Amino acid sequence: MRIGILGAGAIAFGMAAFLAEAGHHPVLWSPSGVRTRKLAEGEPLTATGAVEFSGPVAIARDGREAVADVDAVVIALPANGHRMAFDAALPHLKPGQPVIVSSHSSFGALYLSKRLAERGVLLPIIVWGTTLLTGRQQPDGVSVSVNTVRQKVDVATLPKAASAEGKALCSKLFGDRFVERDGLLAIALSNLNPQNHLGIALLNLTRMEKGEKWGQGEHV
């Protein structure tokens, strides 16, 4: 399947490598274009660790290219970038084209659903309680070190009538690791990433300021 990934950080690179290694065709989009510049010039995407992959991936020049002619769209940005990604994709999303939000925060799916309704577009919005994997992007601009691939990921779909379809798509793309939850509120409550990362960040600020290499697990 051809999958548009809106984002170009560690999670987006890791997901692209995961999908490509599984035989799918990811299309990465960097809103600024900076993080995909070398990939757009033909350098291979390389993943090491829990996901092993090296090869070329498609790069979209804008939001329209990232969404056009793909079987599904994945939002793989920090939560403060979700609205920008939604707005970039909105004019180009087609009825029935699934959108996966990895991971879901602040009921962004409701915003996307309401904006799509203004266009008369109905599609499944699939939200995750966390990301598929964890990792760190490397300074070379084309590599990612994948630390873990999660065994379980909570998932819910809007509208609820499309829940079975949403879970089936996720399993087809990413394997049998998804646990269906009742709805957006359950996903919001199960998403522990914001508060967990806040605590880690507060006690490691100087490491980040100095650009040190440090692992979250051993510095909690």
What is each stretch, according to the model?
Residues K152-V220:
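Active-site-lining helix/loop region of Rossmann-like oxidoreductase modules
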Residues E52-V70:
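Short acidic low-complexity segments
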